């Protein structure tokens, strides 16, 4: 069902060329990052999703982390705002960093799996934009505040 909805969304994007605003969070603990594999698209991603009307970026990232992986997060740092112009849409994503978090037991039905990976051994299926930001963090490189995702 989720794959069918995703296909419908891609058709919608082709026709209407929407602008989207989303959030992602880099959850780091003991040199490892928590990534999720979704049920409707292949790959491993940092948790996140869309910002709802009337919601701040911080509220959105906290809600998405709770919904997807039952995470309660402490202090957040905004790393930057990144853009991606693919699949006939204009994506804008705010990326946060959190090293103070706890995970519960439940997992959203959209999430097939959540797993920690060492920052120096990420799976091949991590999209380029996610991998670039994770590599910058791992290497201690200053992460640009703006750029491509």
Walk through the language-model features, giving the residues of each.
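Acidic, metal-coordinating catalytic segment for phosphate/diphosphate chemistry
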Residues: 1-24
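A cytosolic small-molecule/anion-sensing beta-strand core signal
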Residues: 29
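Short loop/turn segments immediately following the C-termini of beta-strands
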Residues: 38
């Amino acid at each position: 069902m989720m794959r069918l909805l995703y296909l419908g969304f891609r058709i919608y994007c082709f026709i209407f060329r929407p602008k989207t605003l989303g959030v992602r969070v880099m959850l780091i603990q003991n040199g490892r990052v928590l990534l999720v594999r979704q049920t409707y698209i292949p790959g491993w991603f940092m948790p996140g999703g869309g910002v709802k009307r009337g919601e701040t970026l911080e509220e959105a990232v906290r809600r998405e982390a709770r919904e997807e992986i039952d995470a309660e997060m402490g202090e957040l740092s905004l790393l930057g705002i990144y853009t991606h112009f693919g699949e006939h849409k204009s994506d804008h994503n705010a990326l946060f960093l959190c090293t103070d978090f706890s995970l519960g037991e439940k997992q959203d039905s959209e999430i097939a799996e959540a797993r920690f990976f060492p920052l120096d051994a990420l799976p091949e299926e991590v999209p380029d934009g996610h991998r670039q930001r994770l590599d910058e963090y791992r290497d201690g490189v200053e992460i640009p505040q703006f750029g491509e995702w």
